[in-house]
Structure formats: structure tokens, C-alpha cells
Amino acid sequence: MTAATFAPGFLWGVASAGHQNEGDNTASDTWFAEHVTPSVFQEPSGRACDGFTRWREDVGLAAGMGLNAYRFSVEWARVEPTPGVYDAAALDHYEAIVDECLARGLAPVVTYNHFTAPHWFAMRGSWLAAPSADRFASYCEVVTRRFGDRISHAVTLNEPNLPRLLSWLHLPGFVRDLERATLAAASEAAGVPS
């Protein structure tokens, strides 16, 4: 086996996604949609990998593998569970992850949005609503003010091309039907006309 040489500054790391890893993301749009019937989700995320409480282990594993970067997402629904109200404990939590990365020699790479958003944001029209960009920018600004000076890189939106890419797969009609049924059930449960 030969050793590869990477350019100085090359980031070799691992990544996690808030909703998929942290668990108990109860204020998010996805959590809400997981708990309606019918649902496109086969199984609710629940505690997921319990990454919200076990994050130090994740960071330690990344450092222990000799990597130099750890990408994680900041869950908007935790940071801003209600419009304009920012949760100091959630910000403390994500700031601690940044600081632990730095202490372990890992470049912290922060993703501001990894598919999920606050439930209140979805109730107000989600990304299609006129003020959505301003709402998202406000959240990003709060997070960046808190620890942006210590992150290596920022990813605004995780895989923004994915919906378009999935549309090319020509999924069977029942998948689209279930997706529409999930959205209708979520709208009904939330008291929003679909």
C-alpha cells in the first residue's frame, strides 16, 4: 500500500447531520412530519444516535482516527425554536462542539441547514415564503456572531441540489403519492389548509 500525499491544508474528515444524528429534534418540521399518519417516514428518528448528548464521543472518534476536520450541522429548530427567540443553551451546546474540535486538532466545519427547519418556519410557508431568506439569514447571523470566528468553513445549505437530483430518478408514483399524503396529514395536524 502506498501513502497518498495531500496538499497542505487539505481537510480529511467525517460529518454528521443534526436531525439524523442528534435525536429528539422535537421543534423541527421533519420531526412533526414523522409523527403524522400517513407518513413517508418508515420510522421516526426518535433519539437517533443520541448525538446531542454523545457528541464528545463523536469528536473523539474523529480525532482518534487521525482526521483533521469534523463537519456537523447546527439545528436551526434548536437554536430558534420560536420565531425571533434564540435558545442560549442550544448556542452553548454548539459552541462547545466547536471548542472541542479545536482542542482536539479538528477544523470545525459548520452546516447551517441540513434539510430540517423549525416547525414554525414550515407553518409560515417554509422556503417558498417571501421572508424565508431573511429569517434564515437572521439565524445564520446569530450563530456566526456566537462562534463564527472559530470555525474553519461554513456550509450554508447541505446538498441544495438533492430535490432536483431525486426528481430525475423517476420514483414510482406511490412514493410521490405518499409524500403528498404526508404533507396533507401534516397540514391537517397543524391546522393549516393544504
Task: Show where each model-derived region lies.
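Glycine-rich, proline-tolerant flexible connector loops at the mouths of alpha/beta enzymes
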Residues: 74-88
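Short, flexible active-site loop motifs that bind/organize anionic cofactors or intermediates
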Residues: 45, 52, 81-84, 126
